[in-house]
Amino acid sequence: MARRSQGTKLHLAVLCLVVSCHAIGLSDLMERASQRSDKLHSLSTSLTKDLDSHFPPMGRVMMPRPSMCHTSSLQTPKDKEQALKVSENELISLARSLLLAWNDPLLLLSSEAPTLPHPSNGDISSKIRELQDYSKSLGDGLDIMVNKMGPSSQYISSIPFKGGDLGNDKTSRLINFHFLMSCFRRDSHKIDSFLKVLRCRATKMRPEAC
């Protein structure tokens, strides 16, 4: 019941966002998007810590390298200094491309979480669903933003996700689940950083304050 109530509130918030955002300024839209991306990154960090609490001893050795994340093919700024040099249109395109690239992986994580061999799989499953909700909410908000910014900001890179199975044994499932979450946490940080730079520009803040 609590989960349903929470989901209802979020969906109402999304509906209000879609209905009202067309009537508010771009800087306010940037602020709302930044708040949602911050929550997305915070949730992914919390999930990663949950997984760390029950990780196989050899997990760190066996887990794929970050370069194996399916979004690694997308060229993105490496830090804030580089992001500050990128145009608004490119930053919003990168944020939307990364967000869209995680639709299918989040579906996989959501389906695997309830039976994950982890003592906190119930909490993990709940947080994954929250990630999906906030990802959808953020995506809807960014769609409204690009409509205000014009056609040149609407380009999205297609990033295929080929993984559809976390493995059969317990160790493989834990490691691959953790790997995907680590990739998502990295990308959620990028999305949050890009949107904060956009927010700074919209509010004319000094670069060092971003």
Curated annotation (Swiss-Prot):
Disulfides per UniProt: 69-183, 200-210
Any one of the GO BP annotations: negative regulation of gene expression
Alphabetical list of PANTHER family matching this protein: PROLACTIN, SOMATOTROPIN,PROLACTIN
Protein name: Prolactin
Gene3D superfamilies: 1.20.1250.10
Family named by the database record: Belongs to the somatotropin/prolactin family.
Signal peptide start-end: 1-23
SUPFAM superfamilies referenced in this protein's UniProt entry, alphabetically: 4-helical cytokines (SSF47266)
Lineage, top ranks: Eukaryota, Metazoa, Chordata, Craniata, Vertebrata
Subcellular location: Secreted
Main localization (coarse): secreted
GO annotations of cellular component type: extracellular space
Organism this protein belongs to: Oncorhynchus mykiss
